[in-house]
């Protein structure tokens, strides 16, 4: 066989193999899902991320005609569930729904995965603020009064977080930096435990996700005094933004969906479309608007954009607050 003939045959075989690979990928996307999909929530039940997941999972179940099963894998501030997803086979049957803690963890932990390059982004779901929520025994009725109290009693006010390095931790440390206060961090293994101690009065406050604390604020069991987003939230317009008292302070919590790196583009596209359509359903819009969530509507890249933004932001918070990285 001549060199030219060998080249033609080899080139043909390469093209054939490539086309076969593309056809197989397309076929998988068209027949997907053929069995239940596991949606990992890297936190204990009851928190904002869990509530968002349980709102969207039934809609995805209807759209795909296969169960989308919530798998709560709490621990490590969300890193355990995230690593489990990163290590999963990229076939679309293991996905992960995360919050801002996914980015804040990268600012404080030495992670066994890269939160940007080791994943396949699917969709940004929405953004909102956290609510400074006080136990009723705390006398402060405003952000200004809380700052005055914290300055008069440095390190005496205890604030809860859902874990070291999580968004409830670093958003509060950003407040300490901007307001010139010192409040003591008490980390918990999830929202449920933190809220239990807050309601019991063992902890004085939390910068809590709206899905978790808003019902308690409305019931009078907690007192919300300030929202972390740059502007007031339409769900609670009577509560001022912290920035009205502390100029330049702003922090949001977002929710997003992703899968393991190598997830076929067709599966990513189907999930992105399903999430965006689900977010426009009247009952979903009403539920999430009631939780104060501003719904997103964009391509997978929108998720990566907010991750990159917040990894950089909270690395600076960790540095400025002199928080020791966790190895």
Where are the regions that the model predicts?
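Short, low-complexity disordered leader/linker segments with a strong preference
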Residues: 1-34, 326-327
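Extracytoplasmic/secreted proteins, especially bacterial periplasmic and envelope-associated proteins
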Residues: 51, 55, 59, 80, ...
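Short, charged, surface-exposed secondary-structure boundary motifs
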Residues: 194-197, 234-238
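Hinge/capping helix and adjacent helix->loop/strand transition within the periplasmic-binding protein
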Residues: 87-93, 107-193, 242, 247, ...
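N-terminal (or domain-start) structured segment
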Residues: 25-118, 156-158, 164, 180-207, ...
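A ligand-binding cleft/hinge motif common to bilobed small-molecule-binding domains
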Residues: 101-110, 169, 176-178, 205-237
